[in-house]
C-alpha cells in the first residue's frame, strides 16, 4: 500500500500535493531546491537556476475568486487581480493554515529518481537528493513531480538569421526584471504572449521606440470585462462552456471574434490571430491598444533578418534601428532527475495520461502535477490533479489499461504546436471546465446539477450560469469543504466589495426590476430545456 510520497517542488502545485496527501493519511516529503516556498510567485532580483523567474510588476491573469485553492479563498481585502508579492503571501497563509511547511526540506536538490529493482511488484522509487553538499537517499512508495514548465527558456537563435552579428543586447524574457534597462533605447520584443506583451508595454513608458513582433497574432483582452467585472468570472461559466462544445465551430469562432473585437478591432491594430477557428489562449493586457493608438508600441510581423544594429521584418523592406532584443519565445520542459524510460519528452510533449501519469508504467506511482496550460488558473487545476492522484495512489479509483491510456495520449499529440511556446492542447484550452470535471467525475466529486436543482435550486443556478470558481471542486466528494456553498453564493459580493470603496446611492428603477423578472423567467426556461 502506498504510504510515503516524495514531492518535488514547493510551488503552487507542490503545496497542494502536500495537503492532499496529508488529508488522506499519506506521508508526504517535499524537496524544494530554493530557500523558501512559492515557486514562480517568489520574486528575486536575480534569476535562480532551476526555478521559474518573474519580473517585478507581474500581476495574476486569473482573478482572485477564480485562482484560489478550492477550500481556501483569498483574504477579502486582496485586489481582484493579485500582485506577485500578495500571491506569495497567500501561499504562505495556505501553508500555515494546513501546517504544510513541516513536510518541506528546503535547499534540497533532487538529483535522481529511479525505479527500485522490484518496481513491477512494489512500485517504489529511490530518490537521491543533495542538501548543503551532503547526498542522501530514501525509498518512497510514490512520487509527485511539481516542478512546472517555466524554468528552461526556449531561445531558437537559428530561427533569426544574422542574430550573431547583432551588436546590441539580446536576452530571453526569463532574464527580465525591471524596465529601467530600456530607457531611451530602441526595443524589439519577439513573441506576443503574456510576458512579451507585458514587457513591450512596460518598455514603451521609457524607451525611445518599441516594436512587438508576432508570427501568429493573438486575441488581446483586458482584465476588466463586461460591466467592469473580472474577465474570467464572465467568460468561464459552465453554461458558456456547454455552448462552446455544442455549437458548430464556425458559430463559436464568430461569437468569440465578435466578443474579442468589442474592446478594439484586432485587425485594425495588427494583432488579430492568423487562425481564428479555435480559441487560443488570449493575451491579458490592460494597456496594449492604448499604447498602440498613441504610437508607443508598433506591431510587426516575424523577423526576416537581424543586422549589426537593425532588424528587417518580413514584408517590410525598411530596416528598423534596434538597441535591445527581448526574446519572449516560451519555454521547453525537461525532467533531468528522471530517466527517459520513465518520462520521455519529444517535440515539447510528454506521454502523460491526462497530462499526469506516464501511460506505460506497470504501476501508477509517479505523477506529474501542473504540466498543463489550461484556459484557467493553474492553482485549482493543479490542486484537482493532486486530489485525483492521491485517490489513485490510495486505490480508491483506478486507471484504464495502458493501451487505452496510450491511445488518448497519441490522439492528443496530433495537436501540433506552432510559434515558439509550449504545445498547448486545443481541447484543454477550450475545455478547462471539462478537463476538471473529468477528473472530479472519477473521484465522485463533480457536482450533480440535476439533483441539486431539486434540492438547492439557488446553488444549482449559480453553479451553472455563474463563474466556475474553484469552490465547485470541493463542494462534494472526498475532502469536500463545508464552506463551499457559502463561498459560491457570496462570490460576487466579495468581488464588488474590494472595488466599491466609495458608496454611491443608487435610485431604484422599475424597468430594472421588470428586466430582472424577465431574466429570471428566461433562466427557468433555459434550465428546463437543458436538464429535462
Swiss-Prot record:
UniProt-annotated binding residues for FAD: 9-13, 32, 40-41, 61-62
GO molecular function per UniProt: flavin adenine dinucleotide binding; hypotaurine monooxygenase activity; monooxygenase activity; N,N-dimethylaniline monooxygenase activity; NADP binding; trimethylamine monooxygenase activity
Listed cofactors: FAD
Tissues and organs where the protein is expressed, per its UniProt entry: Liver.
Keywords noted in UniProt: Endoplasmic reticulum, FAD, Flavoprotein, Membrane, Monooxygenase, NADP, Oxidoreductase, Transmembrane, Transmembrane helix
Positions of the record's site feature: Important for substrate binding: 208
Cytoplasmic side: 532
Keyword Oxidoreductase: yes
Catalytic activity, as annotated: hypotaurine + NADPH + O2 + H(+) = taurine + NADP(+) + H2O; hypotaurine + NADH + O2 + H(+) = taurine + NAD(+) + H2O; trimethylamine + NADPH + O2 = trimethylamine N-oxide + NADP(+) + H2O; N,N-dimethylaniline + NADPH + O2 + H(+) = N,N-dimethylaniline N-oxide + NADP(+) + H2O
Listed EC numbers: 1.14.13.148, 1.14.13.8
Compartments in which it is found: Endoplasmic reticulum membrane
Main location (coarse class): endoplasmic reticulum
One Gene Ontology biological process: taurine biosynthetic process
First-level EC class: oxidoreductase
Residues that bind NADP(+): 60-61, 195-198
Known role: Broad spectrum monooxygenase that catalyzes the oxygenation of a wide variety of nitrogen- and sulfur-containing compounds including xenobiotics. Catalyzes the S-oxygenation of hypotaurine to produce taurine, an organic osmolyte involved in cell volume regulation as well as a variety of cytoprotective and developmental processes.
Protein name (record): Flavin-containing monooxygenase 1
Taxonomic placement: Eukaryota, Metazoa, Chordata, Craniata, Vertebrata
Gene coding for it: Fmo1
Amino acid at each position: 500500500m502506498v504510504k510515503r510520497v516524495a514531492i518535488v517542488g514547493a510551488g503552487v502545485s507542490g503545496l497542494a500535493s502536500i495537503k492532499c496527501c496529508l488529508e488522506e493519511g499519506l506521508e508526504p516529503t517535499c524537496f524544494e531546491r530554493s530557500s523558501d516556498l512559492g515557486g514562480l510567485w517568489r520574486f528575486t532580483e536575480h534569476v535562480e537556476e532551476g526555478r521559474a523567474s518573474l519580473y517585478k510588476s507581474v500581476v495574476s491573469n486569473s482573478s482572485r475568486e477564480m485562482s484560489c485553492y478550492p477550500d481556501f479563498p483569498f483574504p477579502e481585502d486582496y485586489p481582484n487581480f493579485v500582485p506577485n508579492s500578495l500571491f506569495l503571501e497567500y501561499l504562505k497563509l495556505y501553508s500555515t493554515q494546513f501546517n504544510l511547511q513541516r513536510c518541506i526540506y528546503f535547499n534540497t536538490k533532487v538529483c535522481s529518481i529511479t525505479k527500485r529493482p522490484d518496481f513491477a511488484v512494489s512500485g517504489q522509487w529511490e530518490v537521491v537528493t543533495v542538501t548543503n553538499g551532503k547526498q542522501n537517499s530514501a525509498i518512497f512508495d510514490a512520487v509527485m513531480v511539481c516542478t512546472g514548465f517555466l524554468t528552461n527558456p526556449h531561445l531558437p537563435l537559428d530561427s533569426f538569421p544574422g542574430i550573431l552579428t547583432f551588436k546590441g543586447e539580446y536576452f530571453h524574457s526569463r532574464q527580465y526584471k525591471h524596465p529601467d534597462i530600456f530607457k531611451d533605447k530602441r526595443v524589439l520584443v519577439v513573441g506576443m504572449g503574456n510576458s512579451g506583451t507585458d514587457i513591450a508595454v512596460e518598455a514603451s513608458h521609457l524607451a525611445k521606440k518599441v516594436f512587438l513582433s508576432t508570427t501568429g497574432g493573438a486575441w488581446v483582452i483586458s482584465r476588466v470585462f463586461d460591466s467592469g467585472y473580472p474577465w474570467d468570472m464572465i467568460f468561464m461559466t459552465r453554461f458558456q462552456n456547454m455552448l462552446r462544445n455544442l455549437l458548430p465551430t464556425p458559430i463559436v469562432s464568430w461569437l468569440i471574434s465578435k466578443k474579442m473585437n468589442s474592446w478594439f478591432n484586432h485587425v485594425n491594430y495588427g494583432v488579430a490571430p492568423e487562425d481564428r477557428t479555435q480559441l487560443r489562449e488570449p493575451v491579458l493586457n490592460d494597456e496594449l491598444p492604448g499604447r498602440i493608438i498613441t504610437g508607443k508600441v508598433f506591431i510587426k510581423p516575424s523577423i526576416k533578418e537581424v543586422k549589426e544594429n537593425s532588424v528587417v521584418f518580413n514584408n517590410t523592406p525598411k530596416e528598423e534601428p534596434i538597441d535591445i532584443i527581448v526574446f519572449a519565445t516560451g519555454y521547453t520542459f525537461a525532467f533531468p532527475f528522471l530517466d527517459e524510460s520513465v518520462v520521455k519528452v519529444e517535440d515539447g510533449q510528454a506521454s502523460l495520461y491526462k497530462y499526469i501519469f506516464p501511460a506505460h508504467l506497470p504501476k501508477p506511482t509517479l505523477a506529474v502535477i501542473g504540466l498543463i496550460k489550461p484556459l484557467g488558473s493553474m492553482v485549482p487545476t493543479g490542486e484537482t490533479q493532486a486530489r485525483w492522484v492521491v485517490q489513485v495512489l490510495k486505490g480508491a479509483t483506478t486507471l484504464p489499461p495502458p493501451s487505452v491510456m496510450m491511445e488518448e495520449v497519441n490522439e492528443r499529440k496530433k495537436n501540433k504546436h506552432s510559434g515558439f511556446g509550449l504545445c498547448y492542447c486545443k481541447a484543454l484550452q477550450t475545455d478547462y471546465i471539462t478537463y476538471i470535471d473529468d477528473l472530479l467525475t472519477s473521484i465522485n466529486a463533480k457536482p450533480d446539477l440535476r439533483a441539486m436543482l431539486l434540492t438547492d435550486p439557488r446553488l444549482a443556478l449559480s453553479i451553472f450560469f455563474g463563474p466556475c470558481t474553484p469552490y465547485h471542486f470541493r463542494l462534494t466528494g472526498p475532502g469536500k469543504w463545508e464552506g463551499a456553498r457559502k463561498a459560491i453564493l457570496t462570490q460576487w459580493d466579495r468581488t464588488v466589495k474590494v472595488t466599491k470603496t466609495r458608496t454611491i446611492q443608487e435610485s431604484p428603477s422599475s424597468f430594472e426590476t421588470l428586466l430582472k423578472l424577465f431574466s429570471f423567467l428566461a433562466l427557468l426556461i433555459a434550465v428546463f430545456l437543458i436538464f429535462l
